[in-house]
From Swiss-Prot:
Record's subcellular location: Secreted
Annotated GO CC locations: extracellular region
Name of the protein in its database record: Sauvagin
Pfam families found in the cross-reference section: CRF (PF00473)
Length: 40
């Protein structure tokens, strides 16, 4: 019963990290867009 659970956990963590990274990138993109708009 052991291994499958740990694999599930790893996948879950990976998914969460990817999700967080995506959100961070979008935040960064939004900030960059704002800066661009400010300079124009």
């Amino acid at each position: 019963q052991g291994p499958p659970i740990s694999i599930d956990l790893s996948l879950e963590l990976l998914r969460k990290m990817i999700e967080i990274e995506k959100q961070e990138k979008e935040k960064q993109q939004a900030a960059n867009n704002r800066l661009l708009l400010d300079t124009i």
